[in-house]
């Protein structure tokens, strides 16, 4: 009997590698962080079989599929699965519903002396499992008295850095691959909404399994770049207690320069590519900056880029960063804080907030 498993919790907690035998176009729409796309059929083959299925039915589509994936095509694909299994002996495989494609892949591997477990219900069942857990976890946290802390603070105060020092934190911006502002994009694209939800659900499950008594998240908006936090989970952590990270202006300027200039430039092939991205980001907030301030910031930015090119130093970028922080981001932050009027349970500098949140874990 061919082995199957729907022990999705074990897959998540053990981070078991998965072979996704769906076509690349399906994989791109949504998958799992531990999955590797080694398809049974490529996009063109899948489309051809799909058309045949609609026109001639199931049996003819199956026959066509076997003709398309003949020995010449089959052998390198089986070899790819075998190589993956040699590297990850505990690997499992799946297709969309745990049906014919994963059964065929499983049988072909068995014919070559390799036994592999396939996911019962496939991608669809695993995805449903994760979404259900993301829905029920807030209630479970409440029932078990697990406290959520929303970490707030002005732009550049080091919230993400602080999160990375805590064992009981989840970095939503990290999962979304976006720093949550007009300048927050990375060279690598953001995950799809589906992938973000899948990864968030796994992060929450792993957090819960560690037995912490509190969860710390950055005080985010509903949308982080192009992805959004699922409503049930968002409402839950927004209802948590508030802690505020404070930092003097010059420290915030320095942190912002390191993250948005120095580290950001390292992601791009050339400094010019980064400059193009930054000019586009300035353009996205031009209306909110106002014409005069926009021109002033852009002039400081151009001067900083020229100075960096000449001296290989980054310090001149502090001038435009300081303007953005004090004249753009800080007023927006003050407005939002006044609008929310939420109780701040604790506030302090980096070390004080870190110590406080560590004690809550």
Swiss-Prot record:
Transmembrane segments: none annotated. The active site is at residue 95. Keywords: Selenium, Transferase. InterPro entries: Rhodanese-like_dom, Rhodanese-like_dom_sf, SelU. GO terms for biological process: tRNA wobble uridine modification. PROSITE patterns: RHODANESE_3. Its EC number is 2.9.1.3. It catalyses: 5-methylaminomethyl-2-thiouridine(34) in tRNA + selenophosphate + (2E)-geranyl diphosphate + H2O + H(+) = 5-methylaminomethyl-2-selenouridine(34) in tRNA + (2E)-thiogeraniol + phosphate + diphosphate; 5-methylaminomethyl-2-thiouridine(34) in tRNA + (2E)-geranyl diphosphate = 5-methylaminomethyl-S-(2E)-geranyl-thiouridine(34) in tRNA + diphosphate; 5-methylaminomethyl-S-(2E)-geranyl-thiouridine(34) in tRNA + selenophosphate + H(+) = 5-methylaminomethyl-2-(Se-phospho)selenouridine(34) in tRNA + (2E)-thiogeraniol; 5-methylaminomethyl-2-(Se-phospho)selenouridine(34) in tRNA + H2O = 5-methylaminomethyl-2-selenouridine(34) in tRNA + phosphate. GO terms for molecular function: transferase activity, transferring alkyl or aryl (other than methyl) groups; tRNA 2-selenouridine synthase activity. It is an enzyme of class 2 (transferase). Residues 12-135 form the Rhodanese domain. PANTHER family: TRNA 2-SELENOURIDINE SYNTHASE. Belongs to the SelU family. Involved in the post-transcriptional modification of the uridine at the wobble position (U34) of tRNA(Lys), tRNA(Glu) and tRNA(Gln). Catalyzes the conversion of 2-thiouridine (S2U-RNA) to 2-selenouridine (Se2U-RNA). Acts in a two-step process involving geranylation of 2-thiouridine (S2U) to S-geranyl-2-thiouridine (geS2U) and subsequent selenation of the latter derivative to 2-selenouridine (Se2U) in the tRNA chain. Monomer. This is tRNA 2-selenouridine synthase.
């Amino acid at each position: 009997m061919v082995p199957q498993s729907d022990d999705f919790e074990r897959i998540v907690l053990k981070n078991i590698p998965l072979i996704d035998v769906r076509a690349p176009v399906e994989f791109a729409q949504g998958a799992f962080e531990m999955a590797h796309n080694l398809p049974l059929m490529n996009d063109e083959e899948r489309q051809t079989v799909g058309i045949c299925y609609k026109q001639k039915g199931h049996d003819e589509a199956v026959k066509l599929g076997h003709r398309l994936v003949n020995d010449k095509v089959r052998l390198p694909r089986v070899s790819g699965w075998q190589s993956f299994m040699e590297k990850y002996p505990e690997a499992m495989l799946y297709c969309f519903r745990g049906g014919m494609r994963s059964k065929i892949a499983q049988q072909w591997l068995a014919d070559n002396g390799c036994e592999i477990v396939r996911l019962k219900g496939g991608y669809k069942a695993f995805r449903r499992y994760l979404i259900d857990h993301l829905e029920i976890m807030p209630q479970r946290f409440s029932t078990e008295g697990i406290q959520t802390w929303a970490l707030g603070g002005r732009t550049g105060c080091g919230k993400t850095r602080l999160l990375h020092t805590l064992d009981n934190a989840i970095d939503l911006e990290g999962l979304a691959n976006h720093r949550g502002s007009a300048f927050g994009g990375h060279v690598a694209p953001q995950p799809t909404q589906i992938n973000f939800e899948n990864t968030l659900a796994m992060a929450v499950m792993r957090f819960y399994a560690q037995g912490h008594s509190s969860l710390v998240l950055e005080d985010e908006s509903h949308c982080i770049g192009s992805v959004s936090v699922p409503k049930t989970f968002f409402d839950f952590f927004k209802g948590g207690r508030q802690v505020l990270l404070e930092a003097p202006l010059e420290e915030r300027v320095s942190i912002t320069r390191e993250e948005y200039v120095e580290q950001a430039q390292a992601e791009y092939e050339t400094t010019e590519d980064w400059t193009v991205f930054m000019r586009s980001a300035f353009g996205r907030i031009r209306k909110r900056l106002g014409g005069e301030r926009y021109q002033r910031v852009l002039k400081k930015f151009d001067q900083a880029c020229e100075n960096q090119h000449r001296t290989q130093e980054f310090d001149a970028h502090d001038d435009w960063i300081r303007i953005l922080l004090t004249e753009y981001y800080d007023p927006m932050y003050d407005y939002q804080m006044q609008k929310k009027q939420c109780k701040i349970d604790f506030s302090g500098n980096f070390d004080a907030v870190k110590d406080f949140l560590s004690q809550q874990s």
